[in-house]
């Protein structure tokens, strides 16, 4: 299936770099790995800097055939907290208006936000909040579920809540590395994951690996090591699949290996 899978890319693959250098690294990586593509690239918070009009103009000039999508928590206004599905208040409206404006410049028409936290609102209230966001905005707002965290109770963090997300009939994004953490805590629910991926409400899927404890964005080298890999065939044709694997880990290991060889 690896040969047939069309995996789009994200600047999370090269964390810590400014957006333009990250895109240069992504371009090189797509030349080495035929399953990776740059038709649609997500601009992620792991990148250094803030997304603004000037950056988007520069990106479109250098990569005219690529659509750029803002990823959840990406910095668009200096000093502002990111908006979650559970966020509310006037500052949220200001943030969303700027986000919508930038998204219209990119032409992609969609933005995904993290589900948020129980200390901000209940799960059902969050679903209602996201429905309102979608009715008020002329872009699609998709919810990205989370996983169990130590210090804060996230919304959409276990299988029961992922089932409720499926039943809520709202747009969503599935991060399979998040589901690996849920599976480590509660056991696998293959049929539920299959249904989540197969739904028309699943607008995008994020891929990376981890050991089931932290969202560490490890590279996936051999698909047979990932329990979720065979389930990707159930995705709708319109669902976009993105790599979020941190490839700077591999670069660091190669540099250390070369230093040892030179000694």
Where are these regions (language model features)?
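Short acidic, glycine/proline-enriched helix-loop-strand junctions
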Residues: 64-69, 136-139
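A cross-family glycoside hydrolase active-site/sugar-binding cleft signature
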Residues: 8-12, 41-46, 69-75, 112-114, ...
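Histidine-acidic metal/acid-base catalytic patches
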Residues: 2-11, 16, 20-34, 63, ...
């Amino acid at each position: 299936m690896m040969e047939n899978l069309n995996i789009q890319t994200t600047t999370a693959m090269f964390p810590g770099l400014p957006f333009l250098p990250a895109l240069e690294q992504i371009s090189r990586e797509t030349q080495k790995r035929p399953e990776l593509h740059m038709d649609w690239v997500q601009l992620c918070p792991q990148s250094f800097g803030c997304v603004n009009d000037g950056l988007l103009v520069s990106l479109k000039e250098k990569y005219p055939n690529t659509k750029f999508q803002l990823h959840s928590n990406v910095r668009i206004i200096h000093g502002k907290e990111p908006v979650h599905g559970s966020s509310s208040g006037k500052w949220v409206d200001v943030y969303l208006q700027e986000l919508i404006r930038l998204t219209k410049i990119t032409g992609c028409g969609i933005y995904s936000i993290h589900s948020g936290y129980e200390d901000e609102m209940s799960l059902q209230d969050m679903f209602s909040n996201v429905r309102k966001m979608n009715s008020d905005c002329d872009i699609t707002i998709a919810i990205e579920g989370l996983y169990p965290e130590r210090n804060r109770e996230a919304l959409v963090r276990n299988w029961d809540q992922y089932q409720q997300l499926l039943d809520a009939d709202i747009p969503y994004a599935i991060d399979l590395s998040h589901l690996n953490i849920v599976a480590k805590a509660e056991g696998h629910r293959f049929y539920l994951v299959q249904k989540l991926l197969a739904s028309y409400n699943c607008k995008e899927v994020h891929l990376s690996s981890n050991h089931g404890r932290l969202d560490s964005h490890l590279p996936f080298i051999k698909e047979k090591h990932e329990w979720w890999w065979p389930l990707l065939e159930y995705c709708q044709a319109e669902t976009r699949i993105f790599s979020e694997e941190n490839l700077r880990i591999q670069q660091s290991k190669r540099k250390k290996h070369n230093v040892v060889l030179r000694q």
